[in-house]
């Protein structure tokens, strides 16, 4: 079983810290995988973390870490991350399931799970 932290949270939500690179790194260091929200800036190829909008500029190297699951929040971020074989990403809005770039089924809360979920 893989334990996946949501935006770095491991003991309930902390909206002031979630998606901050230091908060994410702390969860990774504790042995969790982490789902992060990633936004893309058009034309520059740069990426940022944040739930409702880009908040923290981030480099590709950070996102290449084992255990990070990148939730692309827009087509720009998904396109740019999908070109990097070392970044694990997926995109969905209200879909029951999304296929990640590493072949996992990302299933929304309360949806049926499979051996690939």
Give short role names for the model-derived ranges.
Residues 1-117:
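Phosphate-group recognition and catalysis centered on beta-loop-alpha active-site segments
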């Amino acid at each position: 079983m893989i334990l996946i932290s949501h935006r770095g949270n491991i003991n309930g939500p902390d909206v002031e810290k979630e998606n901050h690179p230091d908060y994410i790194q702390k969860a990774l260091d504790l042995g969790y995988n982490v789902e992060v929200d990633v936004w893309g800036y058009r034309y520059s190829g740069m990426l940022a973390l944040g739930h409702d909008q880009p908040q923290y500029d981030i480099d590709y190297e950070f996102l290449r870490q084992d255990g990070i699951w990148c939730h692309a929040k827009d087509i720009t971020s998904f396109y740019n991350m999908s070109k990097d074989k070392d970044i694990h990403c997926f995109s969905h809005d209200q879909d029951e399931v999304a296929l990640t770039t590493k072949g996992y089924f990302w299933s929304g809360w309360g949806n049926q799970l499979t051996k690939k979920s």
